[in-house]
Amino acid sequence: MPSGLMRANTSTELESILDIVQSSGEIAVVFTSPSIGDLETITSETQRRQLRIAGIPRGGYTILPAIPLYDDELLQMCERYTAASEHEKVEIRNSLYMREYPLFAYSMRNQRALFHPADYVSRILQFCFHYVQVPDEDVLSLQDRSPFLHISPVKEICVHLRLIVRGTPAAPDESESPVPEQLHFHAESDAEKLAAERARALSIAASSGGASETEPLSLFTGVAPSALFQKGAVEEVDLDTEETIEDLTGEETVDAVHSFHSEYLTLSGFELVTKASIFYDHEGEGQRVVAVYIPGGVPKETCRAAAAVLELAVTKKNLRAATNGGLPPDTGIVGYYDYLTNPTQHKCRETEFSRRNWGLFSQSESLLKHLDKLYSQLAPTHHHLQRVAIPSQYQLCGTVFSTITVNRNFRTAVHTDKGDFRSGLGVLSVINGEFEGCHLAIKSLKKAFQLKVGDVLLFDTSLEHGNTEVVHPENHWQRTSIVCYLRTGLMSSVCEMERRKHLNRLILQQLLNTEIRHTTVNINEADSSLPPLFVPTRLASQLAPVQLAALGFIVERTNKQSGCVVAMTMGLGKTLVALTLCFSHLHLAPQADILILTPKPIISHWVDEKNKWGMYGLHFPHFVASDGLNSLEFEQQLLEYERQKNNEKPKAGHVFVINSEYLAGFLRRFRRFTPFLIIVDEGHRVAAKGNKLTESLDRLRCNLRVVLSGTPLQNDASELYRLVGWVNKGVSKVLPPKRFQELANSINQFVEGDDGAFYNAVMAQEYIQDWMRGFVFREMENDLPPLHDYLLVCGSSNVQREYEEKLGLTETAMTALRATEHRPHHLSTHPACYLAFISNCYQSMVSGWTVRAQSNTSRLRTTQLEEIDAMRLEQYAQMIENEQLDAFINVSGKMRVLVDIVLRVQARKEKLIIFSLYVGSQDLIHRTLTALRVCTFTVRGRDSQDRRRRAMHEFSENKDLTVLVLSTKIAAYGLEFTAANHVVLFDSWWNPQADAQAIARAYRRNQRKPVTVYRLISATENKFVLRSQTRKIALFKCIFHKRTTRQALPSELEDCSANETDNERRDFWAKLKATHLVGDTRALLNVYRYQESVRESQ
């Protein structure tokens, strides 16, 4: 009997034989018998272990190990191997030992492997090559001798390769139909054969009661359509039936009017323009086009043909009375509209008129295409940006317009158009009528444009404009005009998610009840106007609706050779979105390279995510990342890539995950490196002014740039401008830096407390939001559990107050304090921490607590301790050593409050993360909690990636580990600690986004419990940090939310401890307020809800 085959003949052999196959990689032959079991027993146990089964030899069954590669990956490898030279075959076999096998690791999770998966893959490659080479007359004889020809996907791959190489479709079984062009990798024929034998066995032993059908014997067994997407990711109602659509006619908001009284313009004071012209907002550098006038731009017959249809949309049921002297005018909306503020289920859709009259709309097509052509010729930059931004689903007749406003006999008062795409222009044309006057006047230009039937005006609709008087209105004047534009709301995350759910429903309708056998699925296939978006079939159900929407947004932009910014709240899964995007691009362009830039601490997070989702089919043959753990492997991968670049090896696409500090060296090494796609994680770094990183990336000449950031705006609005300008260079041409800064200044002025700047701030806010909408996918909301965010103002002990006076920490002095001055922070932690810091004798907890008293008594300003200070420091050390912990803790308000929070969390058997900026504070917190016998683990910036991973694992798995102490500025990135549902920010940084990142370590996807955040501030240093934070938060909300916000005044903050709705928390606040420090000051002075530190203006 050949080596590796054995005959089962003992009563306990099935389990032991399968154990041997699984652990040794050898194959085994079994026969049905009372001692082994029937066919159902053999197949079900084999499937449970994910092993393979072949129906040979006659009367028996061959059990094979699980194939450690995905089906399509094995196909690609076999294709390469079959076409390779002998030397290249050796290299391919050697490379098998250098790669990862996540499927193998998963299948062996309960077994110890005695073989390398590369050995098994090598055998399959060699067999496929041999099968391709044998003469036609010998092919069928292999069927009885090779179990590989009875398992999928090896069987299909062999037939496929032979068809390509030899042109003969000789299949293992002549009765089988030819292999389809698109391979379906499953063991259907084997399963049918086995099922038939099993059915015969069951018919003989019918008294056994029957059994369920056998699943297809393949690692990828297919996915039912109902399981393709997760719950909530598929549209629930049929939009094609009129009964399901609410009639919202007239509820569209297209104007922004900022006055209680209608203001009408007259021709006096305006220059009348009658000749073709282009107008700019100012002369000189940085000017932008604001109006293009084209008299006779469209043939009159084309206009009147369109008017016959469009005039039917006009109605007096509308919200535009403010621009018509208080009475509703004759106006209507055609095309698509975003009803984001309406209480309706479907927000983004056709207007009622459009839905009922699409059949007539073809009469307007010629007019729209005429206007679109004029637009592209006379304002090409605006037109291109609008072409990039508009979702294909909302294009009217293939143009860059999504929406048309139709006005009849409507002399508009002064207004601006609300919700138009600000990187584009509105296109105005008169299409019917007999009248005189009623010119369109733009106030800032002091120009009025004569518009007769066929005349066209492209203009910036954010500028205040209105119609001049009608001449001889008593002559029954008639005038029909249209404005064509792109509604920015249609590009919102709400609309993107609605689109995605609709597409998912169409996909499921196409599939009907057919099981999905492909390992990948094009989730955009239902709409031919969309670019393909390939996702691993098993992964599709793991992607949340917001992730699917983000992917759709990105691929539409990259398909139009533009980049974009993905601004999603931390924890919503941006990394998975980016990896899926890489997968789709490599599926379409297998030889393309992708560059991912990420901060060094997050590289390991990318590797972990890649490994985690690999079990769902998200795998990459060449994923090169340096996380500091496998530097040798990283260098070997670079050498392999170098050989490809030198044409020594076949080209294969690589995904490089590197940090920005290494980028320069990488580009020096690979001078011809031309990535197809660049992804920048924590991409707000490319927004820094004069950034060398952007200079390096610009030299790569890659237009497909995707920025990932939960915090795209860190300090001021100019960062956002540089960020959007980096992903699409054309944006700065339509909104020069000077103009953007004027808008940002208007917002800043209001945010910082100037209520008189409210009107200008609103205008600027709306403009910036509409300008960036086409290039920024923003989703700041989430469906996570509740977040309770509190600001706890802690008291100071008499010792702390004494040192505050010594340092001159008055309010006046503190306003001038440099951000780099750490003394107040250490003092608010504990006087011991402060004294140790200024004496320069602090050692970490690894070395223990030591005090080196100075021999001389110098002044405090010399950073040496006075005698009394040295005695105090020694006294504090003794308190810790003698476990006089309450006495030690009560010298600091922050420490007292922190310890009580920790003990409360411990009593509830929950977990807590403590973030601090300073090593001294981290060490003191760790030492104090350890002395209290609270199991605590600390992760700091200098710690290795291995220690961080160990911390994540321990914190998740060890029930006794209650507290993690983390460095805010380092450990706040790339780590997930959803085991914790309490977060303490022991001190805060000037940038609120650093704190937001820290909170997101616990408050993120996969968090199942409500999360409570405690921000501890002292009465000294932290309130100035808080003022800086609230200003920036107000700015962020102004720009990324439709909220005009400002800093709350101190008098507006209300202590919420007494009206706390949670009884247990209310009692806890009362207990803290009743606790006194040394010197009889309360440990807790006030409790505020953090969100109330920023106020919305109504």
UniProtKB/Swiss-Prot annotation:
Free-text comment on the cofactor = Binds 1 Fe(2+) ion per subunit.
Subcellular location(s) of the protein: Nucleus
Q: What cellular component terms from Gene Ontology apply here?
A: nucleus
Which Pfam family name is an example for this entry? Helicase_C
Q: Which cofactor does it need?
A: Fe(2+)
Keyword terms: ATP-binding, Dioxygenase, DNA-binding, Helicase, Hydrolase, Iron, Metal-binding, Nucleotide-binding, Nucleus, Oxidoreductase
Q: Which GO terms describe its biological process?
A: base J metabolic process; double-strand break repair via homologous recombination; reciprocal meiotic recombination
* Thymine dioxygenase, as annotated region: 1-540
Per UniProt, Fe cation binds at 415, 417, 465
Residues bound to ATP are 568-575
InterPro entries hit by this protein = 2OGFeDO_JBP1/TET_oxygenase_dom (IPR024779), Helicase_ATP-bd (IPR014001), Helicase_C-like (IPR001650), P-loop_NTPase (IPR027417), SNF2-like_sf (IPR038718), SNF2/RAD54-like_C (IPR049730), SNF2_N (IPR000330), SNF2_RAD54_helicase_repair (IPR050496)
Residues noted as binding 2-oxoglutarate in the record, renumbered to the chain: 479
Molecular functions (GO terms): ATP binding; ATP hydrolysis activity; DNA binding; DNA translocase activity; helicase activity; metal ion binding; thymine dioxygenase activity
Q: Which reaction does it catalyse?
A: ATP + H2O = ADP + phosphate + H(+); thymine + 2-oxoglutarate + O2 = 5-hydroxymethyluracil + succinate + CO2
Region described as DNA Helicase: 541-1098
* Presence of keyword RNA-binding: no
User: For the Helicase ATP-binding domain, which residue ranges apply?
Assistant: 555-730
Function recorded in the entry: Dioxygenase that catalyzes the first step of DNA base J (beta-d-glucosyl-HOMedU) biosynthesis by converting thymine to 5-hydroxymethyluracil (HOMedU). DNA base J is a hypermodified thymidine residue found in the genome of kinetoplastid parasites, which is localized primarily to repetitive DNA, namely the telomeres, and is implicated in the regulation of antigenic variation. Probably also acts as a DNA helicase. Recognizes and binds specific regions of the genome, hydrolyzes ATP and allows the DNA base J de novo synthesis.
Task: Identify its protein family.
Answer: In the C-terminal section; belongs to the SNF2/RAD54 helicase family. In the N-terminal section; belongs to the TET family. JBP2 subfamily.
What protein name is recorded for this chain?
Answer: Bifunctional helicase and thymine dioxygenase JBP2
